[in-house]
Amino acid sequence: LSIRRQRQMCIRDSSLSLRHDGLHDIKINAALCIACGKCVRSCPANKEYGYEGYFDGFAQKKYYLGYHADNRIRRESSSGGVCKTLIIDSLKNGMVDGAYSLKCTDSFPFAQGEFYTREHIPSFGDMPNSVYHSVMACTEIDRIQPCKRLMLVGTACQLRALNSIIKDKCDEVVRVCIFCKQQKTLDSTRFLAKMMGTSVPPNLKFRPRYRGDGWPGIVRVDGFELPYSRAAQIPFGKRLWTVPGCGICGDSFGMEAGADITLMDPWTICSH
């Protein structure tokens, strides 16, 4: 989550290398390293977050059930299209001047950060549905231009990283947190592909789709598919192939990251 920031802070040479599980390693040139400690201080693994009493005020918060009024958009989106609608309509109606979120790409990891403006408003198809493999969402933060009101969209860890670099970019920030308790590595996708009777090619030239086609949706790898309700049982139910940083994060709702709105699936709404 802070790899981009660590690389920016490093005054010596550093590089990224893609691992087999889809995560990245930072490689520091030991011959040039002066042991300044900036990379260590910027890493959230070395910070303490106070989660005691985290849920105490939840009964006083407001909760809403939302979805897009267009049934086609609602069906094709991850969770009713609420997140994409917030971005698009906020830009169209002048509620924000800029928004930083994700856009779809043609190569792995099939998504990257993008800065949207009132002159550059995305369509619903321009932005990905939920992505259940690691995406370095903050690699394009240099694209964020100064604006009056900026919307940031991401998980709690992504919002924390974005918070550290937008201080001089805007007068006001609206933070939209994507509820997250665990993100997956590419090994999870490989497991799901195997369940479908296919595989993820070594060159990573494939096309995954983790949500959409109704709710909770369908997981697809190329032309193969699996109901999400079944696909989530082992990777999420057993907490397998989880990104290591998720083990130190207790801020699923993004409260410590200053979230104004948190979006999540209403998994148990029928039981209440």
Functional labels for PLM-detected ranges:
Residues S2, A35, T155-A156:
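Alpha-helical architecture
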Residues S2, L18-R19, R143, D168:
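Generic structural signal for beta-strand residues in well-ordered domains
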Residues R4, I26, C36, R239-T242:
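Residue-level signal for mature regions of secreted extracellular proteins and peptides
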Residues E48-H272:
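Iron-sulfur-associated redox domains of electron-transfer enzymes in respiratory
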